[in-house]
Amino acid sequence: MGSMNAILQTFEFWQDRRMPYVETRRSCFGRTCYKSHSHPTFSIGAIDEGNSVFQSSFGTAQKITAGTLVIVPAHVEHSCNPMPNQAWSYQMLHLDLAWLNQLYSEFQEQGLDLHIPQDRK
């Protein structure tokens, strides 16, 4: 991870007016720490590089590493910060809760199976 120390921290946000129900954020080689907070959106985070400490109102702090996927329901207080003196990279997908609930309702109305598919070996 030494190579991450020499690279400047960057942040990118993405939104498209054609899809107002989705927003993404990407942080590369970040060291910024944030206080515990919540979002009005359903959020999915992917750790690309480095290590972090994830804490939420669901339980104790957990060390998470590259390759970890974190799911945070709307309005759940949480924090996710790099390990001390380390940088990390991650991506966040924020989905509007009203849009997600509408999508879920439409699936139910159409009788679509909303269960997670299982491997049928």
Predicted regions and their residues:
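Short, intrinsically disordered, charge-balanced linker/junction segments flanking boundaries
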Residues: L114-K121
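Short, extreme N-terminal leader segments that mark the start of a protein/domain
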Residues: M1-W14
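N-terminal regulatory/effector-sensing and dimerization cores
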Residues: F11-L114
